[in-house]
């Protein structure tokens, strides 16, 4: 499947949040996903919100996630991406740190 010159193995992908630290994207691609999205990645490392940060709402059969984008930061993510061993579409979900200046 082709979209804007990007060649996807198929249309089924794995969205951001599963591999927040960019440590398993090659292995996940080997499972057959058409694309992998890592992150959320912020410019600087951050630990995320204090625990508990995931809450179950039994009455609604749902979860609330307030993880706070815990990740090792952009520099570490760039190193891990540089070691990528396979060719596939890799997306990166990005956000700013709470201390970042500029637009919200």
Task: Please provide the spans of the model-predicted regions.
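Active-site-proximal loop/turn and secondary-structure-junction residues that shape catalytic pockets
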Residues: 20, 40-42, 94-98
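Conserved alpha/beta-domain cores
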Residues: 8, 16, 29, 68-86, ...
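Active-site-flanking structural segment that lines cofactor/substrate pockets
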Residues: 1-23
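A gly/proline- and charged-residue-enriched helix-loop-helix capping module
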Residues: 39-89
């Amino acid at each position: 499947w082709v979209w804007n010159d990007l060649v996807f193995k198929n249309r089924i992908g794995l969205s951001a949040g599963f591999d927040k630290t960019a440590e398993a994207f090659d292995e996940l691609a080997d499972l057959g996903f058409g694309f992998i999205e890592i992150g959320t990645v912020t410019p600087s490392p951050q630990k995320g919100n204090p625990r508990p940060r995931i809450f179950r709402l039994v009455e609604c059969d749902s979860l609330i996630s307030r993880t706070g984008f815990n990740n090792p930061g952009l520099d570490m993510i760039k190193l891990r991406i540089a070691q990528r061993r396979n060719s596939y579409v890799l997306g990166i979900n990005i956000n700013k740190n709470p201390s970042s200046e500029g637009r919200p």
